[in-house]
């Protein structure tokens, strides 16, 4: 592989099992692949080219002709800026295989953080808005959200788990919306914080006991709805751990203060806030 992250034709030949002669023949005959050229005229293939060629070779092994396999690949190719629309449409028609292929394409193109920002979160928002507008039913919303939540869990797993006493991340009792908590755990892990995501709707006594057993110095709670928070008594979060952060659209500074937590305005700066001592002057993070 060259220093710029692309491959020579010899490397592609070894990686795909397709000969250099075949690659040049396809380029002349079908206009695919379309490698870049060095000033000296040598072909350079991207990682996406390599993945495409592996897919096409698999179809050839299944009995397709080169022409049919290349046409099939080009027909399904989507520009990065159109991936969101394609993913949403695939989910709403129940095409999970197609949705998975689009997610993988986005992951290859943007990487984990980029696919989260440019694909998963926009599609999640659009699914929620479509449900609120009455354009899709509960079943479609559940299907799409389940797929997207699973991909977010995959990104969370890819982020690894840094060493050290864990930071426990969950939602308050009665709060089933977990995307905000998953995002908090993901961003903390990317910042080197050992965030342990527990899932949603964790009973406070169990959360308190786990924090003590694992030696967790911090608990982070994300709330989308305000009702579960209002149902909690004053100081309910105070002794979950030495530090407790509460955030999300259902929370606010005054409610956090009432419950005995530090208010987390957004995810930006949360990791840094974990290293700062708690003080009365820090009512919002």
Swiss-Prot record:
Residues 9-28 bind DNA. Residues 6-76 form the HTH merR-type domain. It comes from the Bacteria. One of its GO terms (biological process) is carotenoid biosynthetic process. Requires cobalamin (vitamin B12) for repressor activity. In the dark, binding of cobalamin to CarH induces its oligomerization, which enhances binding to the DNA and repressor activity. Light causes cobalamin photolysis and disruption of the cobalamin-CarH complex, which decreases interaction with DNA and allows transcription of the target genes. Residues 164-285 form the B12-binding domain. Negative regulator of genes involved in carotenoid biosynthesis. Homotetramer in the dark in the presence of cobalamin. Monomer in the light or in the absence of cobalamin. Belongs to the CarA/CarH B12-binding photoregulator family. The N-terminal region interacts with DNA, and the C-terminal region is involved in oligomerization and binding of cobalamin. This is HTH-type transcriptional repressor CarH. It comes from Thermus thermophilus (strain ATCC 27634 / DSM 579 / HB8).
